[in-house]
Design a protein with these regions (language model features):
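Alpha-helical promoter-recognition and RNA polymerase-docking modules of transcription initiation factors
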Residues: 1-80
């Protein structure tokens, strides 16, 4: 992981908890604890940092939110 990717992750780490709360994940709702969802969100944030392309026009925050939300939704669907 590059230093730039690490900076993006550390700067935007609060997005993970925010998105978990926004999408309405509550303890036990999808059979996963908050800590599990947080871990999935952090993995998604790392993935977003690794694949982010600023030349595509989106801010990192916008891109990361999409990647995190999609990964959380995928896990919710597979847990159902």
């Amino acid at each position: 992981m590059t230093e730039k990717e690490q900076d993006l992750i550390l700067t935007h780490l609060t997005l993970v908890e925010s998105l978990i709360n926004q999408v309405g994940y509550q303890k036990g709702v999808v059979g996963m604890e908050f800590e599990d969802l947080y871990q999935i969100g952090c993995i998604a944030l790392c993935k977003a940092a690794a694949h982010y392309r600023p030349d595509r026009g989106a801010t990192f925050k916008t891109y990361a939110c999409r990647v995190i939300r999609n990964m959380l939704q995928d896990h919710r669907e597979h847990a159902s």
